[in-house]
């Protein structure tokens, strides 16, 4: 059943549920769908509707006070399906290395290993509608310092609100309330357990509802999970789960940048026939004291690889640009030509950000329409973040030279050791992947994490957090596939088969 609470009178709210989930994005929908299959009675609270609306989206506005970043009401979406509604579809699991503790990276390591989520990979592939990943190998000629890696693309990208809408609408096991804004979390003063999620619609002076369940899950996204817990300070002044000042800290993103361009004598090489993405090996990361990263080597092709009309366009531009007189004549007739006669393609990076306690979500002094303080993002990087990018780019340039593939032009800002950070949005860079991670990190104890290995909040035995906010380290892989794996693992914890 799906009901918009601003239109339903009276609201068909059951007296109690097995599990109440706040957030109808990837994690929330996967949990609702799979828990229903285990016989659980589920309430799913989604603050938006079926489609984008300014009424809902405006509640995502906030401030950036650290490194320049996307506007907070642009980098995420607030309607059924969540940010999957503008997801690009890229998928890759985290590496074994990403879960481990590394001496050169402070506060690295998870309290779980890849073997704890590996059993859910095939089921996650089915949900994401992607095929299995091929075996990966060291890159020939790299001296064991680089490896070839692969990604899968969900095509078209799965829009979770659309994919599961029919099931959610017809299911007797799941109640979905749209326009249901979570505004408070009630605690039982004796047990410390969550006793209710308090929510309301958009109508001025409209009713306030309480959802009762045995267990509760917050699945609102990497920014909103932290903001919600920090705002839940009516009974716990410092915010729920924030006994050790960890909620909102360790905000991490993936650094996305163009690093340079490569030039080859031939537009097709033995390298271009195989690798498109490379990453440093574990040995290189340890030796160079860097984090994980994926480097995309784009634009290596031959004209024979392109079908008409792309083939003709590429050939024609190459001919026109080769002769300055012809180029001048054509430009007078049709306008400027984009000539890059000897440039084969670009080098770009999707790089891991290492954990940084001072990179965080705070609360603003400004309140939203429901009286909740808005988020403030203070995104901070560390020197190793730049070092990882610079070291990897130089290694790939050396690889091109050693193997007589061609030459590479690395941009000045990458090479400048005195420039500690990549350029920001004002210089035309994407800067990040719209991936919000780490703000309610998993820990072995409440001194180093907000949730335990089962995504249960320390000190609140019936409250769980789902999504990329529980990540301890982030690797370079896009987070959506791992979000689904962790949601399936949480499903098994909440409702063992």
Question: What are the residue ranges of the model-derived segments?
Answer:
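N-terminal Rossmann-like FAD-binding beta1-loop-alpha1 element of flavoenzymes
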Residues: 17-44
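A glycine-rich dinucleotide-binding beta-alpha-beta segment and adjacent secondary-structure elements
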Residues: 175-190, 342-353, 358, 375-380, ...
